[in-house]
């Protein structure tokens, strides 16, 4: 009984947090989610020559095609971010960013690096949640029109987004055999499974947001490394990728798990 009371109290705290932040949370979630694209687009501008030379050397595609690749990445990412933040053509912006993820996965040989591939897929999961949000906004414009219930594509987008966010967590698992690492893995795994199946979703996602935030600031503090060191760019990449997944989890908190979830099924029972 005491454990149930504790869980109920935690859910009350989460609900109170949502009531206070409901006007700002979706905006913060979108900003966090697109942060990795924003940072990468800006980096393309400041490292134009280095990025072009890398693509030209790796793929032997010539100066012109390498320049087109960098330009496409720059315009595609920054343009997509502007559209998402301004709430214009969000679905087209999401599809464009999906294309950028696919393009970079091939161009930078991420396909063969399981850790980076999983992070890119998790990023895609965040975009799926953003697509689901844009669909719900579109429906709200026709609130007075009778409908057949919540659209199935939106429900499955939310499910797919939640499941793909699990992949990001899996890259953070530590396989050190000490008490803290084992405890961290067990608690984190339990929370991410709850998010994936949609049980106690908002509380689990909010707890994961706080946990990832602490890990991100502690382990990926790129600002403490001089900019000329390779580790600076590596940590910066990790920092913004994790921030994007935090944005995806915040969208889960703001929107709920959707129709394909245990939380929704419980209401029917």
From Swiss-Prot:
Primary residence: endoplasmic reticulum
GO biological-process terms attached to the record: endoplasmic reticulum to Golgi vesicle-mediated transport; Golgi organization; lipid homeostasis; lipoprotein transport; regulation of lipid transport
Alphabetized PROSITE patterns for the sequence: SURF4 (PS01339)
DNA repair is among the record's keywords: no
Compartments where located: Endoplasmic reticulum membrane; Endoplasmic reticulum-Golgi intermediate compartment membrane; Golgi apparatus membrane
Nucleotide-binding listed as a keyword: no
Residue numbers covered by motif Di-lysine motif: 266-269
UniProt keyword annotations, A-Z: Endoplasmic reticulum, Golgi apparatus, Membrane, Protein transport, Transmembrane, Transmembrane helix, Transport
Membrane topology (UniProt): Multi-pass membrane protein
Residue ranges crossing the lipid bilayer per the database entry: 64-84, 92-112, 179-199, 203-223, 242-262
InterPro entries for the chain: Surf1/Surf4 (IPR045214), Surf4 (IPR002995)
Pfam families: SURF4
Job description of the protein: Endoplasmic reticulum cargo receptor that mediates the export of lipoproteins by recruiting cargos into COPII vesicles to facilitate their secretion. Acts as a cargo receptor for lipoproteins bearing both APOB and APOA1, thereby regulating lipoprotein delivery and the maintenance of lipid homeostasis.
Comment on protein domains: The di-lysine motif confers endoplasmic reticulum localization for type I membrane proteins.
Similarity comment text for this entry: Belongs to the SURF4 family.
PANTHER family on file: SURFEIT LOCUS PROTEIN, SURFEIT LOCUS PROTEIN 4
Full protein name: Surfeit locus protein 4
Organism for this UniProt entry: Takifugu rubripes
Lineage: Eukaryota, Metazoa, Chordata, Craniata, Vertebrata
Name of the encoding gene: surf4
């Amino acid at each position: 009984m005491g454990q149930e009371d504790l869980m109920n109290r935690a859910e009350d705290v989460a609900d109170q947090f949502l009531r206070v932040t409901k006007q700002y949370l979706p905006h913060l979630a979108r900003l966090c989610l697109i942060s990795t694209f924003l940072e990468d687009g800006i980096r393309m501008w400041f490292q134009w020559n280095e990025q072009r030379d890398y693509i030209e050397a790796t793929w032997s595609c010539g100066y012109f095609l390498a320049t087109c690749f960098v330009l496409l990445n720059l315009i595609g990412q920054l343009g997509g971010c502007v559209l998402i933040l301004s709430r214009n053509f969000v679905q087209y912006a999401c599809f464009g960013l999906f294309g950028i993820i696919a393009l970079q996965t091939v161009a930078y040989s991420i396909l063969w690096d399981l850790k980076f591939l999983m992070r890119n897929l998790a990023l895609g999961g965040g975009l799926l949640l953003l697509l689901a949000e844009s669909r719900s906004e579109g429906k709200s414009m026709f609130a007075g029109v009778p409908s057949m219930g919540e659209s199935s594509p939106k429900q499955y987008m939310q499910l797919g987004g939640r499941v793909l966010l699990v992949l990001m967590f899996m890259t953070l698992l530590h396989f050190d055999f000490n008490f803290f690492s084992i405890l961290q893995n067990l608690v984190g795994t339990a929370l991410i499974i709850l998010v994936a199946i949609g049980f106690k979703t908002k509380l689990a996602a909010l707890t994961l947001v706080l946990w990832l935030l602490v890990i991100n600031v502690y382990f990926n503090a790129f600002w403490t490394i001089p900019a000329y060191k390779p580790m600076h760019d590596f940590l910066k990449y990790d920092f913004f990728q994790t921030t994007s997944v935090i944005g995806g989890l915040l969208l889960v908190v703001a929107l709920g798990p959707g129709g394909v979830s245990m939380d929704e099924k419980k209401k029917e029972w």
